[in-house]
């Protein structure tokens, strides 16, 4: 989890901006969205193979 300590002369807006940047770098929001709904292993494999097929098609085009 991202953690930000607010300095003595630092505004709350700057600290909030740093916190949001750290969260985005750590991938917190994307992880939350990914885990929002359960996805069975078979569905994960299907999505992964479909993405690979799309990449391959795009590359050969």
Swiss-Prot record:
Where are the stretches annotated Disordered?
A: 34-61
Which Pfam family, any one, appears in the UniProt record? Ribosomal_S21
Which domain of life does the protein's organism represent?
Answer: Bacteria
Q: Name one GO molecular function term.
A: structural constituent of ribosome
Return the Basic residues bias intervals.
43-61
Q: Which InterPro entries match?
A: Ribosomal_bS21, Ribosomal_bS21_sf
Key words of the record: Ribonucleoprotein, Ribosomal protein
Q: Which GO terms describe its biological process?
A: translation
Q: Name one GO cellular component term.
A: ribosome
Keyword Ribosomal protein in record:
yes
The family database entries (NCBIfam families) matched by this protein are listed as: S21p
Q: Of which family is this protein a member?
A: Belongs to the bacterial ribosomal protein bS21 family.
- UniProt name for this protein: Small ribosomal subunit protein bS21
Query: Which species is the source of this protein?
Result: Thermoanaerobacter pseudethanolicus (strain ATCC 33223 / 39E)
């Amino acid at each position: 989890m991202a953690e930000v300590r607010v300095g003595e002369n630092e505004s709350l807006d700057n600290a909030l901006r740093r916190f949001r940047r750290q969260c985005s770098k750590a991938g917190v929001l994307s992880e939350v969205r990914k885990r929002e709904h359960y996805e069975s292993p078979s569905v994960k494999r299907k999505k992964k193979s479909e993405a690979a097929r799309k990449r391959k098609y795009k590359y050969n085009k």
